[in-house]
């Protein structure tokens, strides 16, 4: 006879009006994490978690879908206003920001926090296709 798994306590619903949306956009995927002001993750989603596989994860539409899913979960927690921090060179940057706005979150600030080396490690060799 199969054992039934015990269900743990559900995550408590918090009322967090303000937060920060971290959008990490690479050429292969887009990850959206929505945190409170202290940095505690409230909701997250990615293009892969939204059902896209392979090269489709890097598309703007996949980024839009991921941002909508994360925004929906954040709105359930009572979030209204967010600051947006964008990191990376991917194609889903603008679409993800637009999707957060359309979902009903008021964007107060957009900041690009892409890390730039001050002549650090040597770059990878150029691809010859």
Curated annotation (Swiss-Prot):
GO BP terms in the entry:
translation
Q: Which residues form the signal peptide?
A: none
> Which Gene3D superfamilies does the UniProt entry name for this protein?
Ribosomal protein S11
Give any GO molecular function from the UniProt entry. rRNA binding
The record ties this protein, via Pfam families, to: Ribosomal_S11
Entry keywords, A to Z: Ribonucleoprotein, Ribosomal protein, RNA-binding, rRNA-binding
Any one cellular-component term (Gene Ontology): ribonucleoprotein complex
Q: Which cysteines are joined by disulfide bonds?
A: none
Q: Which SUPFAM superfamilies match?
A: Translational machinery components
Q: Which InterPro entries match?
A: Ribosomal_uS11, Ribosomal_uS11_bac-type, Ribosomal_uS11_CS, Ribosomal_uS11_sf
Q: How does it assemble?
A: Part of the 30S ribosomal subunit. Interacts with proteins S7 and S18. Binds to IF-3.
Q: What does this protein do?
A: Located on the platform of the 30S subunit, it bridges several disparate RNA helices of the 16S rRNA. Forms part of the Shine-Dalgarno cleft in the 70S ribosome.
The family annotation for this protein states: Belongs to the universal ribosomal protein uS11 family.
The record's annotation in NCBIfam families points to: PRK05309.1 (NF003698), uS11_bact (TIGR03632)
* Name of the protein: Small ribosomal subunit protein uS11
